[in-house]
Amino acid sequence: MAIPFRLKIIFFFGTILFPISSWTQEVFNYANFSEQLQFINPAFSGIETKAFLSTRNQWMSIDNAPQTTSFAVSSPLKNNLGVGLNVLSNSMFVQSRTIASADISYKLTISEQSEIYLGLRGGGYFYRADPLSLSTSSQLTDPSQQVQASFAPVIGAGLYWTFNSFWLSYSAPQLVKLGNLDPTINSVINIQHYAAAGFNFSLTENFQLKNALILRKSENFDATQQYSSSLSYQNLIELGATYYSSGNGALTGMLNISNLFSIGYAYEKALSSQTSGLDRRTHEIFISVNLDSILGKSPEIEQDEEVETNQQ
C-alpha cells in the first residue's frame, strides 16, 4: 500500500528536525502552554496539520542551566483519525533527558459546535548522565565517574473537548512510573496528570480575549497551576501575560504571518520577593508552520468533511 503524500511530509519534518530537538523538563512548564498542548495531550494530534518547534532557556546567567527544545508535527487523516510525532528533551548540568513519542487520535462529532478527541501515546524515554563531560584541571579520570544511560517505555492517553469558543483538556502523558534510571542519583520519572481549560471571548469584531488555565500533578509533588490571558487583534497579533503558582510571571506575544507561520515569544522571571534577587530570567520562543496552507487539505479529509456536513 502506497504511503499518503501527507504522511510522507510529516515523516520528512520529523526526520529533518529530530536531531535539532535534542534537549524537556519532566514537568511541562511553557508560558505559551495553550499553543503547545500537543506535547502533553496525544488527543491534540488530530486537530491541526502543523509543524512546531520551540526552545526554552532558563536562568540565563547560570552555566549548564536547564535548556529545553521541543518539536512536534501532526495532522488529521481520513476516517476521523489523526497522527502526531513529538520530541521533548532537556539538558541540565551533566544530565540529558529525551522523550520521543508517536500519537494517534480519534475524533467524535457530538454536534455542530462540539467535538471530542481521544488520543493514545507510545514512545521511549532516553536518559543520559555524563560526569566525564565536566572540565577539571586534573588529568586523572575518577573511576567512579561513569556514563549512565538508560531507556524506558512511554505510554500516555488524553482527551480534548471543544464547544464553540470553549475547550477542555485532560491528559496523562506518562502512565507508568519510571524508576532507577540512574541509581547513583535516584533518578525517577513519576506519573503525571494535566488538566487544562480555555475560553475565547470576542470583545469586538477585531479584538478577542483568550483565557486559559492549566493544573499539573505529579506523584509525590504538590499540584501547581498556571493562568494565562491574552488579547488578540484580528488573530494577527497577540499580547498577554502568564502567572505561575510558584511565584513566577511571564509576558507573552505572538505574531501570525499570512496564516502560514506563527512566531511566539515569552519572557519569564520571578515575582516573589524571596527569589526575585536571583537571576531566574527565562526566554522562550516558538515557531509554528501551518502545513495546510502549504500543502492544501488532502482530498480524503475534504471528502470526510463534506460527508459530515451532509449528515448534519
What kind of feature is each model-predicted range?
Residues 15:
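A conserved catalytic-loop motif detector
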Residues 1-10:
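Bacterial N-terminal signal peptides that target proteins for export
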Residues 25-312:
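Subset of outer-membrane beta-barrel
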Residues 11-12, 22:
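Cleavable N-terminal signal peptides
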